[in-house]
Swiss-Prot record:
Gene3D superfamilies xref list: 3.30.530.20
Organism: Arabidopsis thaliana (Mouse-ear cress)
Motif interval(s): Gate loop: 87-91
Protein name: Abscisic acid receptor PYL9
Residues that, per the record, bind abscisate: 63, 91-96, 118-124, 143
Tissue: Expressed in root tips, vascular tissues, stomata, flowers, pollen tubes and developing seeds.
Record SUPFAM superfamilies: Bet v1-like
Resulting phenotype, residue 159 to S: Abnormal stable homogeneity in reducing condition
Residues marked Involved in interactions with PP2Cs (site): 90, 154
GO terms for biological process, alphabetical: abscisic acid-activated signaling pathway
Motif position, Latch loop: 117-119
Main location: cytoplasm
Length: 187
């Protein structure tokens, strides 16, 4: 881990990327919290990946643990969504607020404000960046978070659990995006 980003930050863009990560993925982490960031490289163009990520009202399009989502009001900054979680996880619902949606910089920020789970004071930032993978348009996705460490758990246990969820979401995002990109190429 370099500057809290798995896989390092200097690989794509050098110092510019390090500065970008420090600017957009810096979370104020209190004593009882943990924070981390993960990187996923996707073999699909940015516009396609962003079209999935930006849909605050439809996280189930790529998040495998979401069965249903209801947005209260229009999907704009400050909007709330009620997410139903599939069985098998230690939760059934999560109430989340859209904190940031920047279509020019490709930044999405979400804060969990309720639900029947242990992710208290959870806040995440997801950014999407163009890159070239194997000579084609690709996308680098960075997702960072901060969350309270539940009583009875360690920082390492909490980070491990949240990182596992994010890895699943990012893998699914890559699978869906790459499938859609291959359909675009063949059509």
């Amino acid at each position: 881990m370099m500057d809290g980003v798995e896989g390092g930050t200097a690989m794509y863009g050098g110092l510019e990327t390090v500065q970008y990560v420090r600017t957009h993925h810096q979370h104020l982490c209190r004593e009882n919290q943990c924070t981390s960031a993960l990187v996923k490289h996707i073999k699909a163009p940015l516009h396609l990946v962003w079209s999935l990520v930006r849909r605050f009202d439809q996280p189930q399009k790529y998040k495998p643990f979401v069965s249903r989502c209801t947005v209260i009001g229009d999907p704009e900054i400050g909007s709330l969504r009620e997410v139903n979680v599939k069985s098998g996880l230690p939760a059934t619902t999560s109430t989340e607020r859209l904190e940031l949606l920047d279509d020019e910089e490709h930044i999405l920020g979400i804060k969990i404000i309720g639900g029947d789970h242990r992710l208290k004071n959870y806040s995440s930032i997801l950014t999407v960046h163009p890159e070239i993978i194997e000579g084609r348009a690709g996308t680098m996705v960075i997702e960072s978070f901060v969350v309270d460490v539940p009583q009875g758990n360690t920082k390492d246990e909490t980070c491990y659990f949240v990182e596992a969820l994010i890895r699943c979401n990012l893998k699914s995002l890559a699978d869906v995006s790459e499938r859609l990109a291959s359909q675009d190429i063949t059509q």
